[in-house]
Amino acid sequence: MNRLADKIKNKQFVITGELNPPKGIDLESLFKKAEGLKGCVDAINLTDSAGSNMSMAPIAVAKLMEDKGTESILQVTCRDRNRIAIQSELLGASALGISNILCMSGDPPSGGDHPDSKPVFDIDAVQLLNVIDSLNAGSDMSGNKLNESTDLFAGAVVNPGSEDLDKELARMEQKIEAGASFFQSQGIFDVKLFEKFMESANRFNVPVLAGIIVVKSANMARYLNSNLPGVTVPDEIINDLESSKDRVESSVKIAGRIIRDVSSLCSGVHIMAIGWESRIPRIVSEAGLTE
């Protein structure tokens, strides 16, 4: 059973979370966080060395997490592997029972903790989606037949706050034509901007999960404004966080409010709590989404 695919295909509201595999082999903390999200989210993204900072391979974490009853979304980037290695990993994921794949181009290594690492980028996210479409149809990227086809459910990312919205929408359409069945967006703070984006994106009739970044402090908000393209945390939120006597409570209420405001515009939300995963159940409750 693929809960994520079933809910998306049945047009039900979807909630996903995100966890970063560790730098090391101790998974106790990650499993504890995943356990705390059961019944609250439909699936959990496992990042692929996020920000080009080396961490455990997410495919290993996904398998172990699925064995414990938590559905995963395996992030696959094009940064570190050529087309042979990527196809090999996708076959491995399918053999392990990992179905959900989020296709991403990936961040350049220069910004991570191994800045001298050589980037690969043999293919990009659109081509990666095409690869999955081929594997699901029973052949590899070169047209060679597989002894059994995969059954992968592919998604992609989109940035509603892109400076060039027409270009972003064109890229989104390319991803859909290549096989994207759903999208997770970059973090949303400006609801009117997201509404404008969705007015254009709705013509594609492909589900979009609005990205919700849990902002922990005014300083974090300023950092996002300076370093994350397409993300603008408004002064109102920064001022609220700066003057708050209970930073955690304010952060939870802000995230909950944004979810309430965007929930009628999209097919679900993707909550990026960045270390505050234990607060996601409260955020979901604050948003009025608790069953």
Model-found features: residue ranges?
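Short, acidic/polar
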Residues: 24-37, 57-58, 84-90, 163-175, ...
